Amino acid sequence: MKNLFILFLAMIFASILFIGCSTEDNPLAPTDPGNGGGDPDPIVIKTPRFMHIESISVTGFPQNKPNGDTWDWNPLSSEERKPDIEVVLQRSGNHLPVFWSDRRKNANHTSTYVFTKPASSDDGKLPYDVPYSQTWMISLVDDDFGGKDQMGSVSVKPSSIYVKDNATNFNKTLTSGSLKIKVKGAWIY
């Protein structure tokens, strides 16, 4: 009899628990999706205002010019005839550069070169804030005795690089043929 009474009380308790649950929204949480809770701080995906470029790295470039010639044509400037590389950051179109880097002499096409300093105080500086909705170019240039040779360029479009994850930093490698340029920095919201 005692066991029957305990079983009866357990059934009444279970019934009260099930009756207390409902499918109605919780009136204390009007944003409740109907599951009895609610996210007090829903995640909002932000759109950055700027791509804050802190450094530009060259991790690979063509060993020779498209016609097969070496980059340095003057054998007196370098026995190995390797390029003296610089990077240029500018808005796409016919815009003046906002950053022109210092030079790396006799660069090896498989080595990594990090650029953060300008060639002179008149050549801009990094970090630089690229507006989110604009397209920019980073060009690699060979500074020769006979002039500057364009070695290639990559397009930098922040809206194509951002992955809508509210990230703080970015580290993205952009490629064009055998040219590989890495941009590193932070998103500004």
Residue positions per predicted region:
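Bacterial Sec-dependent N-terminal signal peptides
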Residues: 15-52
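Beta-strand-rich interaction surfaces with strong enrichment in secreted/lumenal proteins
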Residues: 102, 124-128, 170-171
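Calcium-regulated, polybasic anionic-phospholipid
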Residues: 58-108
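Eukaryotic cytosolic "membrane-facing" regulatory regions
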Residues: 3, 21-30, 92-98, 127-135, ...
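Surface-exposed coil/turn segments at beta-strand junctions on protein surfaces, enriched
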Residues: 46, 80, 129-133, 174-176
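Sec-dependent bacterial lipoprotein signal peptides
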Residues: 1-20
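C2 and C2-like phospholipid-binding beta-sandwich domains
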Residues: 68-78, 141-168, 181, 187
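Eukaryotic beta-sheet cores, primarily in C2 and C2-like/PH beta-sandwich modules
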Residues: 87, 114-155
